[in-house]
């Protein structure tokens, strides 16, 4: 579920925002630092966590910055263009922009684009593109014209696909829109005509895009308040031919078409977009997050001071001008899933769980086209490169780990995994973890004797994996009957299918107590009830206990009481002692905490043997009795099952196996106890309903008394 957290002001300094707002917000080489370029003469470097500026640079009076400053991720330097043609390069140590490196270009620049893993690109207003190094080698080189006359660039985006840069920019001419896609590994420039569809008079207010392996998903927010999607192939069938693309409706009426201050649209991930503008039913501007997969509004935040109609998103932060100050709104989102839509997911997150940012694995491309040059030897003496900092090891630790798991022993692999996890997390951390688990599981299938359970447990505890990413993991653990690993998967994975959950339950109920004693199981969800069992037995002998306000001895249910009047000597012991050993109880608690959907779970519960169902019901009934002993109706322990979970599973087991369990003699007393349990609950709710009715009558009488409008005069005689 998407969530917008509490906003905060990045700086109280009023920025020089023009009529159209800021020029831009760009990420620096530090994940917590951002470059903010106003519409005047200044570039400010902010640190978001400290909410303060780290540096500020301005061009001379009379000069004006014409495109946002960006960071060259290869060198750690900053690049900006002022007066359309003058390019400046500096770093944190520089103070005066007038004294840093300067290059005057032969054509006007529209935008400088920079992402991690490749050198910056310079997009000129005439549609030509150059790599920064090739451009600086000859600043006065001739720049060709790509777009036609009166065609104006409206928006651009820079991606890295398969380690190769891909640039897309949108142009407009006389109400017609065109998309240009530049592939730098093959030097292919493809032009597309964007067909507006039925409403040809609509104007596109904002663009955003995301990319996968085959398509660029171009989303546009039109003047009719709707969001449309156009799929642009990364590898066109006929690059030389001008092709037409039709847009499809993605979301309808997300903002008002009569927005005064403009609207903005940005893609947050594959399933969510953020929209800035005035909703149809409100006059004030709002920031809203929409799920494009389910076409639902996830969350919204009102912005009473108004905005400039600009929105930027990096990592987990949304940037915008709220009033006259730059505002940051942290954004969190869980991945949309079928389990979240149909099933019951965990509502609490373990304290040790942390969120891993989803970064693309940017890698430096080899031999990109369009004049990309090897930057090891720069032709510019004035630029101070930080070669010592930017040098990379010949073999990254991630590749060393992947090569180790394919051939080395289990102990050596465990040591290498521990070393890798001790390193600082890199943007490709989750990718390496997934590849490592996949490699280990493939080797497990090829070599039956190979089973690095300790490595697998360390990788699961990184909170990066899920069942859908590595389904073979639990399959192998089920074959090995590794209950410790299965328990950990149940605690960490939110998307386990119901069939796998039932397979785990079968093993947890069938494994012998002797085998469990030799197994290390997480016991934090289990409380040692044997401590209080002796005290409870003495209390039952001395006094009569009322459970939930109901005395079982006073309620005579005919045949049930006739059976229960003949109490065996060990009945008290059965009710106060846990029917399973503590380690089995911990495993069963993991089942109770797991996510499920009743529709998909019930058919698989019917396959569990009746004696195991009876044992599970006895344990659940024992947990219910322990809950009833407390006024809060909760169990002791760090992460125990809740009363709702206990009752839900009792109902599920009886629904699936009642006809089988009722035929078992050893289950007779258990079913009678469950019957009395339900009867006592009905009695409690009946009494509560009576109390509620009484309170309503008293409230009604009180209202009638107050509404009579009568008064009385009392005369006191004094003698």
UniProtKB/Swiss-Prot annotation:
Signal peptide span: none
N6-methyllysine PTM sites in chain numbering: 346
UniProt keyword annotations, A-Z: Activator, Methylation, Nucleus, Ribosome biogenesis, rRNA processing, Transcription, Transcription regulation
GO cellular component: nucleolus; nucleoplasm; t-UTP complex
Cell compartment(s), UniProt: Nucleus, Nucleolus
Main location as per UniProt: nucleus
Any coiled-coil regions, as ranges: none
GO molecular function: RNA binding
Any GO BP: maturation of SSU-rRNA
Pfam families: Nol11_C, NOL11_N
Matches recorded under InterPro entries: NOL11, Nol11_C, NOL11_N, WD40_repeat_dom_sf
Function per UniProt: Ribosome biogenesis factor. May be required for both optimal rDNA transcription and small subunit (SSU) pre-rRNA processing at sites A', A0, 1 and 2b.
Cited PANTHER family: NUCLEOLAR PROTEIN 11
Leftover remarks: Is the likely candidate for being the functional analog of yeast Utp8.
Complex formation: Interacts with UTP4. Interacts with FBL/fibrillarin in a transcription-dependent manner. May associate with the proposed t-UTP subcomplex of the SSU processome containing at least UTP4, WDR43, HEATR1, UTP15, WDR75.
Name listed for the protein in its UniProt record: Nucleolar protein 11
């Amino acid at each position: 579920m998407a969530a917008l957290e509490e906003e905060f002001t990045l700086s109280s300094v009023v920025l020089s925002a023009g009529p159209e707002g800021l020029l831009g917000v760009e990420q620096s080489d530090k994940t917590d630092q951002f470059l903010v370029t106003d519409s005047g003469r200044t570039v400010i470097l902010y640190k978001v966590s400290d909410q303060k500026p780290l540096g500020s640079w301005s061009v001379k009076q009379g000069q004006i910055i014409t495109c946002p400053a960006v960071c060259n991720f290869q060198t750690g330097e900053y690049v900006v263009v002022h007066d359309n043609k003058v390019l400046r390069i500096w770093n944190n140590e520089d103070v005066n922009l007038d004294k840093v490196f300067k290059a005057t270009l032969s054509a006007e620049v529209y935008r400088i684009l920079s992402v991690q893993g490749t050198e910056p690109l310079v997009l000129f207003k005439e549609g030509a593109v150059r790599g920064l190094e090739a451009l600086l080698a000859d600043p006065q080189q001739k720049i060709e014209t790509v777009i036609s006359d009166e065609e104006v660039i409206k928006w651009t985006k820079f991606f890295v696909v398969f380690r190769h840069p891909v640039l897309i920019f949108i142009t407009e001419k006389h109400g017609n829109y065109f998309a240009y896609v530049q592939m730098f590994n093959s030097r292919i420039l493809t032009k597309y005509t964007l067909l507006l569809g039925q409403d040809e008079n609509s104007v596109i207010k904002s663009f955003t895009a995301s990319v996968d392996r085959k398509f660029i998903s171009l989303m546009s927010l039109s003047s009719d308040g709707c969001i449309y999607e156009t799929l642009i192939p990364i590898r066109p069938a006929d690059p030389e031919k001008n092709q037409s693309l039709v847009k499809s409706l993605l979301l309808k009426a997300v903002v008002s078409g009569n927005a005064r201050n403009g609207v903005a649209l940005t893609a947050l991930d594959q399933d969510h977009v953020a929209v800035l503008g005035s909703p149809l039913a409100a006059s004030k501007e709002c920031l809203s997050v929409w799920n494009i997969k389910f076409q639902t509004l996830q969350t919204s935040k009102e912005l009473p001071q108004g905005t400039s109609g600009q929105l930027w998103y990096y990592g987990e932060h949304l940037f915008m001008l709220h009033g006259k100050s730059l505002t940051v709104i942290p954004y969190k989102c869980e991945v949309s899933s079928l389990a979240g839509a149909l099933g019951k997911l965990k509502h609490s997150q373990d304290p040790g769980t942390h969120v891993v940012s989803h970064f693309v694995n940017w890698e430096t491309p080899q031999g990109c086209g369009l004049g990309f040059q090897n930057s090891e030897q720069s032709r510019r003496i004035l630029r101070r490169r930080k070669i010592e900092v930017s040098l990379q090891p010949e073999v990254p630790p991630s590749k060393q780990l992947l090569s180790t798991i394919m051939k080395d022993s289990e102990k050596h692999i465990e040591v290498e995994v521990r070393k890798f996890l001790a390193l600082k997390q890199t943007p490709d951390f989750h990718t390496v973890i997934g590849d490592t688990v996949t490699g280990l599981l493939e080797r497990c299938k090829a070599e039956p004797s190979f089973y690095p359970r300790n490595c697998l447990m360390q990788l699961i505890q990184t909170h990066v994996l899920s069942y859908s990413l590595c389904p073979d993991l639990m399959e192998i653990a089920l074959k090995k009957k590794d209950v410790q690993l299965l328990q950990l998967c149940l605690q960490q994975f939110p998307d386990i299918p119901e069939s796998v959950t039932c397979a785990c339950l079968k093993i947890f109920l069938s494994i012998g107590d002797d085998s469990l004693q030799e197994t290390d199981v997480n016991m934090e969800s289990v409380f040692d009830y044997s401590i209080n069992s002796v005290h409870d037995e003495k209390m039952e002998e001395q006094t009569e206990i009322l459970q939930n306000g109901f005395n079982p001895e006073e309620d005579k249910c005919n045949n049930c009481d006739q059976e229960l009047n003949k109490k065996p000597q060990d009945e008290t012991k059965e009710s106060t002692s846990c029917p399973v050993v503590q380690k089995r109880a911990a495993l069963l608690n993991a089942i109770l905490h797991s996510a499920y959907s009743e529709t998909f779970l019930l058919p698989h519960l019917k396959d569990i043997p009746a004696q195991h169902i009876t044992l599970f019901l006895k344990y659940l009934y024992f947990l219910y009795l322990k809950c009833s002993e407390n006024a809060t109706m909760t169990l002791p322990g760090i992460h125990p099952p809740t009363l709702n979970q206990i009752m839900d599973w009792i109902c599920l087991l009886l629904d699936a196996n009642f006809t089988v369990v009722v035929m078992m003699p050893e289950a007779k007393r258990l079913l009678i106890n469950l019957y009395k349990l339900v009867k006592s609950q009905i009695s409690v709710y009946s009494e509560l309903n009576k109390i509620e009715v009484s309170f309503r009558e008293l409230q009604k009488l009180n209202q009638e008394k107050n509404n009579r409008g009568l008064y009385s005069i009392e005369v006191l005689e004094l003698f």
